Amino acid sequence: TTKKDFMKRIKLLTLSCLMSLSLPSFAQFSPDHKVSLDKGDIKSFIGDKESKGERKVYKGDELTTIGMPVGGICAGQLYVRGDGTLANWWIANNAYNTGYGIDWLLNFDTPLGPWKVCYQTFEPMSYIDQGFKITVNDGNKTITKELNKKDFDDISFIGEYPIAFVEYAQKKQELPVRVSAEFYSPFIPLDAKSSATPATIMKYTVKNTSDKKVTADLEGWMQNLVCIDLKGRADGMLQNKVIDNNGWKSVYMDMRVDNLPAKTAGKNRKYEIFDNFESGNYSRWKVEGTAFGRKPASGEQCNQNNFGGNYGNFLANSYTNYDKPTGKLTSRTFTIRNKYISFNIAGGAHPGKTCINLVVDGKVVMSATGNNNEDFLPRNWDVSEYKGKKAYLEIVDAVDGDWGHISVDNIEFSNSPVDAPTITIDKSHAYFGNLALSVFDGNATGTADDSENNLEYAEAELGKKLNGALTSSMTLQPGESKEVIFVLSWYFPNRPLSYKGSEWNKPLPPNSPAIGNMYANWYNSSLDVANQLRENYAELSKKTHDFHDTYYNQTTLPYWLVQRIMMPISTLATETCQWWATDKFWAWEGVGSCEGTCTHVWGYAQAMAALFPELERNLRERTDYSVSLQEDGGILSRNGEHGILIDGHASVILRMYREHLMSKDNFFLARNWDKIKRSIQYIIREDGNEDGLIVKTQPNTYDISFNGANTYVGGLYLAALRAGEKMAYIMKDTTTANYYKKIYTAGSENTMDRLWNGEYFFQDVDEKEYPKYQYGKDIYQTEAINKALQSIWKFNWTNDVKAQSEAHLPERYYAHAGEPGLFICTWPYSKHPGEDGVRYRDEVWTGIEYQVATEMIKRNIIDEGLAIVKGIHSRYDGKKHNPWNEIECGDHYARAMASYGVLQAVQGYWYDGPKGIIGFDPKIEKNDIIGFFNAAEGWGNISQIRKNGKQTNSIEVKYGRLYLDKLQVTLPEGMNANIVKASVNGKVIPASLTNTNGYTEVSLNGLQICANDKLQIDFE
């Protein structure tokens, strides 16, 4: 088997449940199978795959949901929105659990306000006051505009991760200047440290478009957000300081927790009780429905757990009969005379459905929900704007499912808010740290409080707004442009150890022992971050732009495709990914959701291994083959905890081989070989009789266990054996290699004999003994593999999920009516099993879509594979869903980083670092293509031109270096090259040619190619 064939098989053998969960039958289609055989005009859908196409410019309502991560990898989470404002400020170890993705967990409250997550249409949230404005004077008049959608109605956004480009424009131009901006953090593949800088660069360009000289002031302001999530619950004094850094300016923001002024708020507070329900009746309320009963509840109801914090003996509580009843309480009308309405609330977090509402003039003007727990928390509404108006309250329960209840108590009117319970914090608290807004302009001016000019120091109590600001001034002649570079840097070193995470929609526990952030080993403050960034700005900016240009501008692949492939890779710069101060990479499945860099979900992700292989090797050696490796060779699924998931276990073995291939030598493999053999022996024992089939219980990524022989787990098992065989040969362990090969061969043959029905692979299971979700299909012989992939296209992909989703309601929605998608499971020839079917059967996961598309493209089922990817692109289009946030069990789901496999497939690219081999067999643009390559020590462009009976292949290194001993390519049909000419930068070098196993191999005698060198090989 050639290296090329082997890598195809390895990838293919990881195909998921899609090919293992359809009842094998040749009957007519089941009437409840609603996936149409008519896929539409897919050629029009994917566009011209032989040309690059237009750069995507987002405008108008396409800007709605945009939130592109622009901080460092593993350094928190910060978005730039479609209008160039920043959002989702999870840079202070303050992220929330964004799972589980089900409809009643999409919205919740935070101390800063309502929050939204997962697969719905919304603008990313920001409760931090931050922005930029420009003031321009042309000698006649002065105009000031904020750089956001409020003042610019024709904004353009181009998102090419890691760089976002924003152009500020008005349909009716008022300004004599044009303003544009770039937002990014250093992102340099193969340099994880530089790419993990806790900072965002905001480079503004101002161009005078008039025929007059103008002056312009560009001001950036930023709110001090230190410990802002603790406002109302902790005491501290926010501090802003303007600092002159010898050639650049900063506003440094932190907080002190000592020498605080004595608190007087809350003492002798006067209030009027509207209702605390201690009367034991609803005399002040109109009762509708049955949820709230005929009288107030006396505490928690039957089967209501963890209830506490209510006032007195009675309260309004709609938890009755397991959350099934619904109803509403409507208060008597009252006149608003005080500044605040305060109350205690607990229960469900369903906005508008489990809530208390304030109604003024017939409209709900304020609303609050519970937080999906039973702990009462005080809430304060500032109703001063409605003073003197008539109003009434509604307490609503309109949900009959999970958390379908609301509890309210102690409603008060007052001119001062109820104090929330306070906690004592110090500098070790997870949220404690500092940030800095800087401008690389020594002549800039600054103020510590933007309500006054030129203040060098300002302070405010935690919970009150304190904004610092910097202004850069310029004079522009007609047609002249100037750049101003602002940097937002942060330093929050006390990341808590959150192995267990939190409940859905809750903040990650801040009080766990600190594990720290890796960047705290490199910097001592946010000012230090900004200073080092300034000192190295030219180099870091150039390398980031070099990568951007190499990947986006120099390649000829369809623009939409390269853009989509890179979009989920921004997950590395979200709170899904952490790099601990102990130098350990650790990650969730999605932001705050499902802990422990789990073996099964992360087994799909391909991007980090290609772009930052040191972090994948870190994961293998510091987790999978460290705390997770058991004495018997089993690999625990979640950072040394939980059980062994057999698909994840096999994928770890495969990834060890992948990490070896992305290494420059054999040292990584050699130092781990004994542990690898132990883990392979474990999965062989799961086989039992070495026939290459696993029939015993198989826990896996679907949060269930399979039983019986199948080709989801079975394919991964045989792929792991095949990888083990390859690694054994490298280690000169021939006996072990032959042993693995024997089992692999038996398994491949037995699979074809027992599990192939001529159309797809099925599962061999005793339905009487095991659960009914065990049905199957998958891979092995080439003809069978291709047929099975075509069956997936036929039975699982649709250009509109509406019919199938309405017939078989998914547990969670990741594709809505009118959107295309690939269903995890269908039963085309038998009745859909409903709840007896495999879990998540009716869902659509982008990670699996990328994986299937990768395998289709590798096997020349190209249009269909591209259509699957284009389907993802059409769902995450900006209008409906954030293009940079692919959802599964939580935001920024790691499985979606399988997208990088599509790039490797469409380019027909393979790489063996220790052997110095690159293969290139593009599936599209064969006659004229420029692609992107990544290797152990370098990256750049790889190309192929066919013209006049000749072929030229080139490799241009843009970063690092490349060791290349052999280049394997495919020549056009009918071309039998016998002459090869190789040159580096035009200088001829020795090379020899061999035609073997369907490709042409050029031997280059261990060539070393450095940055900016170009290798060219001409075939005749």
Where is each model-derived feature located?
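Aromatic-rich carbohydrate-recognition surfaces in CAZymes
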Residues: 106-123, 130-139, 522-540, 578-584, ...
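Non-catalytic C-terminal accessory modules of carbohydrate-active enzymes
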Residues: 74, 85-87, 93-101, 105-182, ...
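Extracellular carbohydrate recognition and processing domains
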Residues: 359-391, 396-406
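Short beta-strands within extracellular/lumenal beta-sheet-rich domains
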Residues: 313-337, 376-379, 470-471, 951-953
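Extracellular carbohydrate-recognition regions
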Residues: 263-294, 417-418
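Acidic/polar, glycine-enriched structural segments that form the non-catalytic walls/loops
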Residues: 29-51, 57-58, 62, 165, ...
